[in-house]
Regions:
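Thiol-/selenol-based redox modules, centered on thioredoxin-like
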Residues: 123-153
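C-type cytochrome heme c attachment motif
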Residues: 45-52, 120-122
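Typically the conserved alpha-helix immediately C-terminal to a functionally engaged Cys/Sec
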Residues: 51-68
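Bacterial Sec-dependent N-terminal signal peptides
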Residues: 1-20
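Short active-site neighborhood of thiol/selenol oxidoreductases, capturing the structured segment around
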Residues: 34-48
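A short beta-strand-turn-helix
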Residues: 20-37, 106
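Thioredoxin-like thiol-disulfide oxidoreductase module
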Residues: 63, 68-120, 124-130
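Short beta-strand and adjacent turn/loop elements
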Residues: 42-44, 101-102, 107, 134-143
């Protein structure tokens, strides 16, 4: 019984140190009230590197605080998100391809228009201009470096 109680008390602690995520529509509404730079993370549920990366990034409390305090963060599942998304005055839809598919926005954000690479990171300034783009895994150290560079703009 004591182990269960301890477990129930510790579980919320793990969730307290996670990056706050939102949707594209939430981010655009918040941008109108309080402009901040934006970090967009494109991933898929089958991407093992994405899961490992997410674990390591959320484990770094300094990074989590920096992200939550100074940026809007959109965690975008490129192959499962099926709703229409309005972003930068354009509308994007899910492109069905048999039993799977990909969202048009994932292709629009990717420099490789035929097939996105995951994980994919897109950093925008508070005016939604591209300031950094990275395909592949992002380490906590590299993420902090980029966030500090962008927040200084």
């Amino acid at each position: 019984m004591k182990k269960i109680a301890l477990f129930l008390m510790l579980v919320p602690c793990f969730y307290l140190s996670q990056m706050k995520t939102g949707t594209f529509s939430e981010m655009e509404a918040l941008q109108k009230e309080s402009p901040k730079p934006v970090v967009i993370h494109l991933y898929t549920d089958w991407c093992a590197v994405c899961k490992i990366e997410s674990y390591h990034l959320n484990k770094d409390k300094e990074l989590v605080n920096l992200m939550n305090d100074h940026f809007y963060f959109v965690n975008f599942e490129a192959e499962k998100t099926k709703e229409k998304i309005h972003f930068q005055h354009q509308e994007f839809e899910y492109l069905q391809n048999g039993n799977s598919g990909i969202h048009e926005l994932a292709l629009a954000l990717s420099k490789n228009k035929n097939q996105s690479v995951y994980p994919l990171w897109v950093f925008l300034d508070k005016h939604q201009n591209l300031v950094y783009y990275q395909e592949g895994q992002m380490t906590p150290e590299k993420m902090k470096e980029k966030l500090l560079e962008i927040s200084a703009l």
